[in-house]
């Protein structure tokens, strides 16, 4: 395919035009009085959203150079969303301001590489100040405030704070669609996995369709069980103890399953069989987690353990198990606390090393099942469009709340950037074009506050100057138009969100400024449709 090449100012201006189109569509959503954007879908109803990354993802421009510019800014929004769950619009506004100021200086003859160094030095200094400004999250109310701002709904903030309070820092909070209207929080006690009983005959409570056992033994096997001969020795030992038995295996079939069902129906021996969760290596890892949690061992021929040689020391214990047709919950496993902590540390190390978002998410789920707990927020709404938008907002708010717990909170409303900038630039000792690069960042830091004010119908420049002159930590409450102590008023942002937005924006801005040529695919002309034979006349 033929390529088009643009150089110098033409290349940079093409990229800037694309960036401006995307940024202008995204920045109208910033702040409590930000507007919504309607996104057309090829199939189904349009989506209405004020989430920066969702809007950015939908924008595809026709001009090849503009398209590349827009793609670069999409990357800023996506990266910020991945890291912190929020701050996508802030990152876009910062990137646009830095690029606009930077290109003006490059056109005036500044050295792009020196500007880049100045930008990077200034951003590092501001990031440091942000972390100094940050206060640790100490109360449930602070988590609720942070999540409420992200979701734009106080009731969402409260339910997320409740969930985090229950499952702890390591816990997993998932968001699911519900058929009922409103919000509902469901907490899981103990470890839960998505596999239920193999046969309905194992139920002990037909009304609730559950098998519930107190103080059971738990046999964990990493293979299929089909022969009753292999299973008999351990069954006899468990029967003598008078306790029920939960068997977790790759599969249980044939005479082994029939024997368990017959004994359960006759009331001779209480047991329930479930399939092991996951597949392949992930299944092995999850069985290992269950074994450590319950104080048992995984019976696997790989490590020389055979089913017919199992004794009671090798099986796990728990205070209670609840098995439904879809899931199994193990409450209060009898595992050794030190071993569980060791496993938790091992999973944490794997999370740090992992490059894949999917793997990291699965490892985080395993960690939550061992160390914290699992909370499910069920979301309902009147229409499909509202449901999708609400679910997305709540998922972002959950990540936002976790970011707040991680690195602390700073005053919200774009004020933290302005006030961190006041002290950060005093320390810098830069000259020439590097000092100009730092000045570009200083001007850009006002961008988010200015845009929040504009979206609230106020004069951006006046608001920025007023905030610069008032006490640290005070700023504009755009919802009311007054100036307040932001922390006390609950207008807060996670430091991680603000820091990530600034760092990602500066990274893309530096790329824009140092670009000297752009190579793009030449759009192919679509051939005109051939004329219909006979002049295209139709005979009716």
UniProtKB/Swiss-Prot annotation:
InterPro entries: Chaperonin_Cpn60_CS, Cpn60/GroEL, Cpn60/GroEL/TCP-1, GroEL-like_apical_dom_sf, GROEL-like_equatorial_sf, TCP-1-like_intermed_sf. Together with its co-chaperonin GroES, plays an essential role in assisting protein folding. The GroEL-GroES system forms a nano-cage that allows encapsulation of the non-native substrate proteins and provides a physical environment optimized to promote and accelerate protein folding. It catalyses: ATP + H2O + a folded polypeptide = ADP + phosphate + an unfolded polypeptide. One of its GO terms (molecular function) is ATP binding. Belongs to the chaperonin (HSP60) family. GO terms for cellular component: cytoplasm. This is Chaperonin GroEL 1. SUPFAM superfamilies: GroEL apical domain-like (SSF52029), GroEL equatorial domain-like (SSF48592), GroEL-intermediate domain like (SSF54849). GO terms for biological process: protein refolding. Its EC number is 5.6.1.7. The keyword Nucleotide-binding applies. It is found in: Cytoplasm. It comes from Salinispora arenicola (strain CNS-205). Pfam families: Cpn60_TCP1. Disulfide bonds: none annotated. ATP binds at residues 29-32, 86-90, 413, 477-479, 493. It comes from the Bacteria. Keywords: ATP-binding, Chaperone, Cytoplasm, Isomerase, Nucleotide-binding.
